[in-house]
Amino acid sequence: MKKCMWLLAFCCSSAIAIAQDNDHPDSLLLRRQLFVLRNVIAAKGEQLSERERLYYQAYLDNFFNKGQTSNTSIDLLLQKYRADLTAKQVSELLQVKIDNLVKAYRYKAAYTSSMYLLDSFKTTLPEKDQAAIRNAAVIWEGLQEIAPQELTVVQDTHVPFKRDAVGLVNIPVSIGDTSNEFVFDTGAGISTITESSAARNHLTPMNKYFDVEAATGGIVKARIAVVKELKIGGILVKNAVFMVFPDSALTWPEAKYGIKGIIGFPVIEQMGEIRINSKEGLLEVPQQPLPGSYANFGLSNLRPVINVAYKKDSLPFIFDTGATATALNAPFFKKYRKEVMRRGKPFRLPQGGAGGVNTVNAYRLPEIVLGIADKKPRLPHIPVITAPVMEEDRYYYGNLGQDIMKQYREMVISFRYMYVSFND
């Protein structure tokens, strides 16, 4: 089940002339192949000019969760080389800067930068991008006077979780004196709560509405509410931002299933490291995250991305603990079309999340073997969607779900050191 994300477009395209070579840095950036781009830039080393290094590093540091370093590169690039950049390049760099500001909870600066971008690049930004920036600015405007989110882990924490009727991880969340069971979902950009749950937890949504793109491609009207304090086991979170959805957007009557709330990326990321122990039903958050030997994890806006190997190829996948099963996207179908059509059987795939359910054309492969870090999970009956439903489906080859996570005793996600690993 893919989750929604609001319409804050992350435009990675470059206005530098795109070479035909698929391994050219500009082509890799355009196709959001950031894991490959990292290796290419490291190999080129001194062959790159300072302007080129700053340019590519701004995107790479944004992707690998080094927002402050990314913004330092952007500021220096605009200070020293703005005359060498096109208006399109500058506008896209400013969008990266806004994303870094949002991840640092600097909402006022994000709003100011958004307004500057809209005022200064009217003739450069496509109308679709302007609408997305304007839509997201509604959120940042409402949060201008809100203090940054704070999350405190005073000791190694173990939080028991339950799986609901569709297999999603639900954790206990306390808001004031009210106890809740919310879905724990790395694929949710901003934490989400239904209108009835917001009222039950004495939350007051802000007045302005903004648009959220649902997994079906439809639009949900949402508002923002700020939770002054919430607790997840012994973890205290202050000033957590929630999107407030109409109950109908998180209810599926035909399945007799509904979601009251979702703990999403901003809260999960600030935990530093999480360990989901499927065998014991425990969410573990260590006080001190542990370094890893590789970095196979990145962020596209607030969407986790993981590096996956298939055959000899390195492919970026969305990494979504709120997805019950793995699905392969349109880029996978395009790249391996002959194999998919030869081995697979066509069918209509129900697909949905916050906002409803739709069906899309797909093929079902009997089995596929993927490479993730040092593991090679086998996935039977895997669907391959033939056309993009959401914008991100144009770039990411699949959406990893819980069918992979359940094959291992423990899954580790480190936002501090940017890796994902699985332990038997």
Role assignments for model-derived ranges:
Residues 1-27:
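Bacterial Sec-dependent N-terminal signal peptides
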Residues 20-424:
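Pepsin/retropepsin-fold aspartyl endopeptidases
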